[in-house]
């Protein structure tokens, strides 16, 4: 078998040259090339294009660094002339009358021979070269790789605009390119000699003048032992080039292994290959592609995943699997360049915005390695983002800017990108984000509002270090296991009370204690979903702030926040190596299935239970139901008959085994069902009978009680025999006379909270409170001390947040979600909640917003 580790790959990229003032394609490549070396930079057919040639290498990261360096040098040389390179299949603004072919005898003869076909080649591509042992092997490889070429084209699609108008295609370049008489699907050849004879016959016929004019989608090199991929558009995002190069090398490697094993390439029909290529050019990543062998339509993202699995053995042998898998996830999440260009145009209807996007994506890339999760070395960190950070003055621990005013290493690439975009562009992107949110219904209702509003998503992402995430994962899994044990104990023997771990009054007086909490069986999972809120203190360490065990919300907003960020700010998409969010709905569905009662046989029927569109988080309910593929049900559509729960739809009953409850249990149990009777009694009987599960379980509110919070560290030791991994905020229980005395004596230094408060309501922050507020809360504590707790003030960490065209240091917390099946699973998505400027309350119900949260893999 060939040594996979020594297969070199190289890339040729073509770049349009645009005037940075008019954004128009201009014939000034020769001026730029005079400033660059001829080994790496060369002219093309038209004077408006420059080609770069990478060094062949076996290392994709080295290839990436080389491509970035070539782009940087080209951009610098062009920039000195007021020009910029644009890596895309086509550009939106051009005047054909101003363009001409390069001064080269071969190119001039091609123009004479082919006329308009040559003159209209206002296109750019990216070509990948992979080493093979000889040209005979290269010819054999061509047939093996052919079925996957349309997928690679779809990944590269970057040419929706042609001659100033939307072509309706994702890759208009493909249609223009295929007008050459020798472009498109290669024929079937057994040997290089057969192929060479065809070339000789074509030259003899006068159709072409030399072997270089054979423009098949994949071909052997005319002068090197390589196989060349030529089907792809030029890609603005250099990581897309690396993705395509890595996949193509793996396809070649797989083909060689099959050939060496005596395999024969399955013969796809040329007609289907042409159809598949057309479909990829038409749809890009946003539609279906053609399954060459099944001949049916397949979603592009599903085809990409199939391709990855097909060549995974080769990618693993090249040590490329993790990189390519991450880049594929990034590409699928961001969508094609064609999609991003159309979105840019849709915002204001300006083709200049499309050109600016292409220029920015071509030029504005982090230093080599930065987008792969490696912080670049910086000699002068204090000079990063000097404009955006000019007025940025955090009062305490800031997660992005250190105490000396320097940007922390993990945020340098982020801040550079934001600085390059500048305030005006960032304001435009905020407007585009709000418009897209409104169109997609990503809303939330703030307390006191009669209508929903777009959920505030900040454009500056937050990064949680991989080591921090590992500690949080251990600590939160431990915490949920202890709380699960406590809930079973509270509604069972109450051993923790008998053993003095929790005072009796804490349980008996808890607002969340419910008689219906005894309905689930001893083996039931009570905490199917938990949302644990954490903060970083003044030293940067993590503290648990609150447990949410009833109807924790926010996971859909975390997922949609990522999608919005990738849509409206593609220059700042999460780099490879960041945990994906695409698995979140499946993880939730798995947890809900695990919560099914023992009476269920077969696949449990799951439904999301909502109070309806008036609910503040209805968007989340609907989104989760849709992405899990389960029905969204309101109480009025539920019927319990003979201890079995049904949803009634169009007069038909359909059994429900698991109800994912996104409604307060008191409201649910009082609501009339499909038969007009209150649901509570019948639904609880069904739960007791083991015929239906309600997740989260009734009565869970005692587990997230603010007094109970003070005893969770003891529970960890008592139930699990372990020491807590995570610390809590120091808490004083006013139901304890000594602790109450301390709270009353230090009201102006503490945060006091009502035990039954929700969403930040009733909270008084002593250092920020007015005297009358302190007097009022003192009277309330004295009147009913068991209803109050006091906590030490935690100087919440701050994070740069875009507000009124500048960055403000705003307080942030982190809601981490834990799904409990057989064992708790910490979901690879977190909601970073951000307070309004000047506030410490991050709750969305009080006007807080959120940030996209990047969690690197370890």
UniProtKB/Swiss-Prot annotation:
Enzyme class: ligase
EC number(s) stated in the UniProt entry for this protein: 6.3.2.2
Pfam family, one: CP_ATPgrasp_2
Residue segments, region Unknown: 373-858
Domain of life: Bacteria
The reaction(s) this protein catalyses: L-cysteine + L-glutamate + ATP = gamma-L-glutamyl-L-cysteine + ADP + phosphate + H(+)
InterPro entries recorded: ATP-dep_Glu-Cys_Ligase-2, CP_ATPgrasp_2, GCS2, Gln_synth/guanido_kin_cat_dom, YbdK
GO MF annotation list: ATP binding; glutamate-cysteine ligase activity
GO BP of this protein: modified amino acid biosynthetic process
Location of the region described as Carboxylate-amine ligase in the Swiss-Prot/TrEMBL record: 1-372
Keywords: ATP-binding, Ligase, Nucleotide-binding
Role played: ATP-dependent carboxylate-amine ligase which exhibits weak glutamate--cysteine ligase activity.
Family of this protein: In the N-terminal section; belongs to the glutamate--cysteine ligase type 2 family. YbdK subfamily.
PANTHER family with a match to the protein in the record: BLR5612 PROTEIN (PTHR34595), SLL1039 PROTEIN (PTHR34595:SF7)
Name recorded for this polypeptide: Putative glutamate--cysteine ligase 2-3
Organism: Frankia alni (strain DSM 45986 / CECT 9034 / ACN14a)
């Amino acid at each position: 078998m060939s040594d996979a580790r020594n297969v070199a790959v190289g890339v040729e990229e073509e770049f349009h040259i645009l005037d940075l003032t008019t954004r128009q394609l201009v014939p000034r490549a020769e001026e730029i090339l005079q400033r660059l070396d001829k080994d790496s930079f060369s002219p093309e057919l038209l004077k408006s294009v420059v080609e770069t040639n990478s060094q062949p290498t076996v290392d994709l990261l080295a290839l990436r660094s080389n491509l970035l360096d070539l782009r940087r040098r080209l951009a610098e040389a062009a920039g000195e002339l007021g020009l910029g390179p644009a890596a895309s299949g086509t550009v939106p603004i051009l005047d054909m009358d101003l363009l001409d072919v390069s001064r080269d005898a071969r190119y001039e003869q091609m123009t004479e021979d082919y006329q308009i076909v040559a003159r209209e080649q206002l296109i750019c591509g990216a070509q990948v070269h992979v080493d093979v042992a000889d040209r005979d092997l290269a010819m054999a490889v061509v047939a093996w790789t052919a079925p996957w070429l349309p997928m690679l084209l779809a990944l590269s699609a970057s040419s929706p605009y042609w001659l100033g108008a939307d072509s309706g295609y994702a890759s208009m370049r493909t249609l223009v390119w295929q007008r050459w008489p020798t472009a498109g699907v290669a024929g079937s050849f057994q040997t290089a000699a057969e192929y060479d004879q065809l070339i000789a016959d074509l030259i003899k016929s006068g159709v072409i003048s030399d072997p270089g004019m054979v423009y098949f989608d994949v071909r052997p090199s005319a002068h090197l032992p390589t196989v060349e991929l030529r089907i792809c558009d030029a890609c603005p995002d250099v990581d897309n080039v690396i993705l395509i190069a890595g996949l193509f090398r793996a396809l070649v490697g797989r083909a060689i292994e099959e050939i060496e094993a005596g395999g024969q390439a399955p013969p796809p029909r040329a007609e289907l290959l042409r159809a598949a290529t057309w479909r990829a050019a038409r749809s890009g990543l946003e539609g279906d592609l053609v399954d060459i062998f099944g001949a049916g339509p397949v979603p592009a993202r599903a085809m990409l995943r199939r391709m990855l699995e097909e060549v995974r053995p080769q990618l693993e042998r090249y040590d490329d699997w993790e990189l390519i898998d991450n880049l594929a996830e990034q590409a699928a999440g961001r969508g094609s360049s064609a999609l991003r260009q159309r979105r840019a145009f849709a915002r204001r209807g300006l083709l200049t915005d499309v050109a600016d996007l292409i220029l920015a994506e071509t030029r504005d890339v982090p230093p080599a390695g930065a987008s792969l999760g490696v912080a670049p070395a910086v000699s002068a960190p204090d000079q990063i983002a000097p404009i955006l950070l000019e007025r940025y003055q955090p009062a305490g621990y800031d997660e992005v800017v250190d105490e000396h005013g320097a940007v922390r290493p993990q945020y340098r690439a982020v801040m550079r990108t934001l600085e390059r975009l500048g305030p005006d562009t960032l304001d435009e992107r905020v407007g585009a984000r709000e418009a897209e949110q409104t169109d997609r219904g990503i809303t939330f209702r703030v307390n006191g509002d009669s209508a929903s509003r777009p959920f505030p998503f900040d454009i500056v992402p937050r990064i949680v270090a991989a080591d921090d995430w590992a500690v949080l994962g251990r600590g939160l899994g431990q915490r949920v296991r202890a709380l699960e044990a406590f809930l079973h104990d509270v509604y069972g023997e109450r051993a923790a009370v008998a053993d003095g771990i929790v005072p009796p009054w804490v349980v008996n007086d808890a607002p969340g204690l419910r008689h219906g909490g005894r309905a689930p069986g001893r083996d039931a999972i009570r905490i199917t979903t938990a949302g644990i809120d954490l903060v970083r203190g003044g030293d940067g360490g993590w503290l648990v702030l609150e447990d949410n065990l009833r109807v924790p919300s926010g996971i859909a907003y975390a997922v949609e926040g990522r999608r919005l960020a990738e849509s409206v700010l593609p220059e700042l998409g999460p780099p490879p190596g960041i945990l994906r969010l695409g698995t979140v709905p499946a993880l939730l569905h798995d947890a809900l299935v695990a919560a099914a009662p023992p009476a269920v046989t077969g696949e449990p029927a799951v439904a999301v239970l909502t109070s309806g569109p008036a609910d503040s988080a209805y968007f989340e309910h609907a989104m989760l139901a849709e992405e899990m593929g389960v029905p969204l049900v309101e109480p009025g559509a539920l019927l319990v008959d003979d201890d079995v729960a049904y949803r009634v739809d169009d007069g038909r009953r359909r059994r429900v085994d698991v109800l994912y409850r996104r409604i307060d249990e008191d409201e649910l149990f009082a609501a009339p069902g499909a038969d007009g009777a209150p649901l509570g009694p019948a639904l609880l009987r069904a739960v007791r009978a083991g015929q239906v599960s309600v997740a989260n379980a009734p009565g869970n509110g005692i587990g997230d009680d603010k007094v109970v919070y003070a005893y969770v560290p003891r529970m960890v030791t008592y139930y699990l025999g372990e020491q807590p991994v995570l610390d809590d905020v120091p808490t004083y229980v006013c139901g304890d006379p000594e602790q109450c005395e301390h709270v009353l004596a230090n009201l102006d230094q503490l945060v006091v909270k009502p035990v039954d408060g929700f969403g930040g309501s009733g909270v008084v922050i002593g250092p920020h409170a007015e005297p009358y507020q302190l007097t009022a809360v003192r009277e309330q504590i004295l009147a009913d001390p068991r209803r109050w707790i006091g906590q030490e003030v935690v100087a919440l960490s701050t994070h740069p947040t875009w507000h009124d065209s500048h960055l403000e240091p705003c307080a942030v917390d982190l809601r981490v979600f834990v799904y409990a099946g057989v064992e708790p699973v910490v979901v690879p998505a977190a909601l970073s909640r951000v307070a309004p400027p000047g506030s410490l309350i991050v709750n969305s119900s009080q006007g807080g917003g959120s940030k996209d949260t990047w969690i690197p893999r370890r």
